[in-house]
């Protein structure tokens, strides 16, 4: 089972090395997308079979397997875009047919070509593929304040949709460089815009883009023709303010929008940071915040540990707008919000947590912990903050101890904190 995977650009007259030309002349079966066939069709042998690469890919792989069943020594020559090992079809072949022999003949990938057109060094560029993929890796790059981000798009994650998401969460200190039909001398277009300009623009497919923070542009003296700076879209006087500050280690409580302005309805910043430490989030992958209220714990976790998947639960519907407002204010995209009674929430489609914080339980702590245990990973932990005050009728620490005993959970020694004039707080933690 042998594949030759040949990378091509959008040029209607592709150039191939003599070795590749010989493979094409001798080839018997070819494969690729419709666009690839339109480009290379004139160079293929007459009446050569062509296997279209379309979804579902399982049908494509069945045709490949059928070919090798009858012609085991006859290779399939596959055409793919750019570098087939760069988020490309050669990767897919390796995963599906690990025993296959694969030879790759790459050309420049689309982001390399765009960087070349912009005369932009790209050794420091973070690559994110949104082609058939969700937002998390892109969000992570934004939160980490990456200076240069190369993005592979699709028809859902368009330049306009990407720009709108960035504006919504306050990451508007980037310029966007969009390349369309790269490699096609008749259709190729490279455009540099502000995010605000991009939101109302449509671009032809295929396209890709490179995002560069404004201060990065200044620092690199990037003043290529057609850039945001060259067109005067950015005032040079704004050089020192057109970028986010480093995300703080601890957001001031007063900066959050609160539930009905009630300052006691938020986990205070020092307690919040100690809570995140107790959750061991650097080693975790999925964090659940049950009873998020203002969203302060979820947002702090999102900013400090952007690799996490975060699911936030709250029974009060008015808190949905509050967490959304706070998430946008602090640049924390990607928190999965669930409104309703946690005990009635269907958890089957959610990622299994390995860290859970219970910020509110409404007197149903035992039931909540029992439900959490049905999905908590084997190495997971649960953390809760307990406060004992004259006006607080429910003894959360006692409920916690009883629940841990009934559910056979191993408790860590509690951490007792007294903050300013507030009542003592205990940070409680348990594991399976």
Where do the PLM segments sit?
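Class I S-adenosyl-L-methionine
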Residues: 1-103, 112, 307-310, 314, ...
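A contiguous loop/helix-start segment that scaffolds small-molecule binding in enzyme catalytic cores
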Residues: 2-5, 18-21, 76, 146-221, ...
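Class I SAM-dependent methyltransferase SAM-binding "motif I" and its flanking Rossmann-like core
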Residues: 3, 81-146, 343, 400-418, ...
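Conserved class I S-adenosyl-L-methionine
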Residues: 284-293
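Conserved SAM-binding loop of SAM-dependent methyltransferases across substrates and taxa
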Residues: 294-306
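S-adenosyl-L-methionine
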Residues: 313-353
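A short glycine-rich, Lys/Arg-flanked "PGG" loop and its adjoining helix->strand segment in the class I
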Residues: 369-381
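Conserved beta-strand signature within the Rossmann-like core of class I S-adenosyl-L-methionine
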Residues: 379-391
